[in-house]
Amino acid sequence: MPDYRSKTSTHGRNMAGARALWRATGMKDDDFKKPIIAIANSFTQFVPGHVHLKDLGQLVAREIERAGGVAKEFNTIAVDDGIAMGHDGMLYSLPSREIIADSVEYMVNAHCADAIVCISNCDKITPGMLMAALRLNIPVIFVSGGPMEAGKTKLASHGLDLVDAMVIAADSSASDEKVAEYERSACPTCGSCSGMFTANSMNCLTEALGLALPGNGSTLATHSDREQLFLQAGRTIVELCKRYYGENDESVLPRNIANFKAFENAMMLDIAMGGSTNTILHLLAAAQEAEIDFDLRDIDRLSRKVPQLCKVAPNIQKYHMEDVHRAGGIFSILGSLARGGLLHTDLPTVHSRSMEEAIAKWDITQTDDEAVHHFFKAGPAGIPTQTAFSQSTRWETLDDDRENGCIRSFEHAYSKEGGLAVLYGNIALDGCVVKTAGVDESIHVFEGNAKIFESQDSAVRGILADEVKEGDIVIIRYEGPKGGPGMQEMLYPTSYLKSKGLGKACALLTDGRFSGGTSGLSIGHASPEAAAGGAIGLVQDGDKVLIDIPNRSINLLISDEELAARRVEQDKKGWKPVEQRPRKVTTALKAYALLATSADKGAVRNKAMLDGL
């Protein structure tokens, strides 16, 4: 019998009590010779990306048991960022990532599980589970709930998503009837919101890291093809267990699959597809769990050489995740990166001996396999539903146009530089990030006057009251991991700027973060954050700020002497908002803030503070 981790709780005379409890869960004598595989599900009725997951854990469990394993399912929490947004609920979103990571660790280690199937989907759930998987370093596979279908309405010539509903609601010229129609049409099915927002970005990145099956990031939640991903995940995790515990093959462990080169692959994919800036935060956090020295400087280096090969909402209106799938999904983007000489193709995945082998099999421009072509023709049905695998609609043709299609070749890239950039300067010594894919080229260099807000709430009030004018740079501070606490997303301020016609006339800088639905000159993750003594806390109303994306710089245009003098004064006052914020910070949030690092470290816990405990 292989030397399973689970033997700790299933073998030996002294474990009679534990075995009695295992038997009470349904285990038989023969089961104690099999690997115990944890299924970390994240079903909840609060989140459309998770509302359809209830029965899918048991779908995987049955396949695991057919393949020779023992499956035990548990649940994590899942916060819906869209529902939590715009009020104090958003304070809990990023901290929930740590709770999810810890809960997976607690369950897996407490019960000595041998492997994990992570059933994730939305914004903080995939990152939290990824952090746990790399922390635990036992066989793992990710299978997400899948993206939502794009919304359809006769009032728009393009597909709709959540952001469209938010923008139209803030547009005073839009009728109540139009707002209501957008609201009812924007989110028609179960699944993660239909654009290249944080959830879908992270689920795509699990493919590039080698920890998920092809199609994980792009196959619609409603499509029957997605059922096969869950079934295959169940079979694959048992095979990974056999290789690790039975054959001592350590190459299947997540830290050996998702190594430094794999993180580079994931980041290159993110840059090439113009993914959410939140992915930077989460990849940095996951790298720390894997004990990989991967940081913002690496991301900055990659951003300068990776072109943008894919554009999806919110960066362009005509394409959503269903269109990415039709164009060949993530392995077609990875294939383009490989042919451009950028991708590390020698790395293993949970499903292939190497990324090169996987691309040869799954890139629709490289294979004649009809089954693969059939798979990527899976499309939307346009029928509102909360049921997984409820339709089998197919596109008549694939989008294999690499000159003008959704996914491009190197020669026909949307832009020579990718969709994300890291900026440095005296206002953000440790860096800040911008999704350049969503920024009009006319404002890649922007000088403006600082308009200071001490919270997201006051910024929203100011924007809606027309206090922000053309040429302003909105500064929202004390919204970082420690200062918020919780590093709120700023989708409402950016959406309201857009609705006021200021999307190309203003910029926004914050030590908070942005929804994956954000576009415009929106710069987040300013590090160090204001609450940690960052220079963003020293900016005053009317100060000139220069943003220069081509040169990767952002600077407050005052002398070093003036900046130093302001720091002396701020040290005396303390690094806290000038105005009192009507914000209820609970004990749970205070505990998070106590250990939180700034965004350049992934907003993870400050482990140095814990080392002596």
From Swiss-Prot:
The keyword 4Fe-4S does not apply. One of its GO terms (molecular function) is dihydroxy-acid dehydratase activity. The active site is at S515. Its cofactor is [2Fe-2S] cluster; Mg(2+). Binds 1 [2Fe-2S] cluster per subunit. This cluster acts as a Lewis acid cofactor. Keywords: 2Fe-2S, Amino-acid biosynthesis, Branched-chain amino acid biosynthesis, Iron, Iron-sulfur, Lyase, Magnesium, Metal-binding. SUPFAM superfamilies: IlvD/EDD N-terminal domain-like, LeuD/IlvD-like. Functions in the biosynthesis of branched-chain amino acids. Catalyzes the dehydration of (2R,3R)-2,3-dihydroxy-3-methylpentanoate (2,3-dihydroxy-3-methylvalerate) into 2-oxo-3-methylpentanoate (2-oxo-3-methylvalerate) and of (2R)-2,3-dihydroxy-3-methylbutanoate (2,3-dihydroxyisovalerate) into 2-oxo-3-methylbutanoate (2-oxoisovalerate), the penultimate precursor to L-isoleucine and L-valine, respectively. This is Dihydroxy-acid dehydratase. It comes from Pseudomonas fluorescens (strain Pf0-1).
